[in-house]
């Protein structure tokens, strides 16, 4: 795109390119996904990394028509919900990612070719759901569950650190909730 049309591509990838067995992962670690989704995301990274800016992360956000993501899934539930105490991630909200991409586009030095991890504070799915429960005033009963053991935490890329200041999960979720309700 850059050579032919003068445009640059920012591709969003996933922490699911990793198995979750050897965290934390740097942007130079080789993907080792054990499932089809993660493996195909890893292939897309390989195909694009020489010509695009690949932002590897995990996102949480509101959805328009589905309830597949963790946030919307939880908010659509009623009653008892399992919260995985040993399932860790450190992604960002979709609003935080959008702000970062805007900064990268508007910055003279923000856009670079390669793979870059975008991360925030490491959190378990259980603790994340507890924050969501409090913020959204959910009546769901979150039951601690230790059956799942996975950690897809990423080490934030130095270049991303220079262009983005991340907030804690509560702050990110408050900002996203306010933006979504406007």
Question: What are the residue ranges of the model-derived segments?
Answer:
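Short, amphipathic alpha-helical "lid/cap" segments that border enzyme active or binding sites
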Residues: 71, 75, 94-102, 166-181
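C-terminal amphipathic/interface module of NAD(P)-dependent oxidoreductases
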Residues: 138-182
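Conserved Rossmann-fold NAD(P)-dependent oxidoreductase catalytic core, especially the SDR/UDP-sugar
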Residues: 1-32
């Amino acid at each position: 795109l850059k050579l032919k049309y003068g445009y640059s591509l920012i591709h969003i990838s996933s922490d699911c390119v990793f198995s979750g067995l050897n965290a934390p992962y740097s942007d130079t670690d080789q993907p080792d996904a054990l499932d089809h989704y993660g493996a195909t995301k890893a292939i897309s990274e390989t195909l694009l990394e020489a010509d695009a800016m690949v932002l590897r992360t995990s996102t949480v956000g509101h959805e328009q028509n589905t309830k597949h993501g963790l946030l919307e899934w939880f908010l659509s539930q009623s009653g008892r919900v399992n919260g995985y105490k040993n399932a860790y991630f450190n992604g960002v909200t979709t609003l935080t990612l959008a702000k970062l991409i805007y900064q990268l586009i508007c910055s003279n030095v923000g856009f670079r070719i390669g793979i870059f991890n975008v991360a925030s504070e490491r959190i378990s799915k259980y603790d994340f759901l507890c924050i969501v429960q409090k913020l959204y005033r959910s009546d769901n009963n979150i039951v601690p569950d230790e059956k799942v053991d996975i950690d897809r935490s990423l080490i934030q890329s130095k270049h991303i650190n220079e262009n983005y200041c991340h907030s804690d999960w509560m702050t990110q979720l408050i900002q996203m909730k306010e933006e979504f309700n406007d």
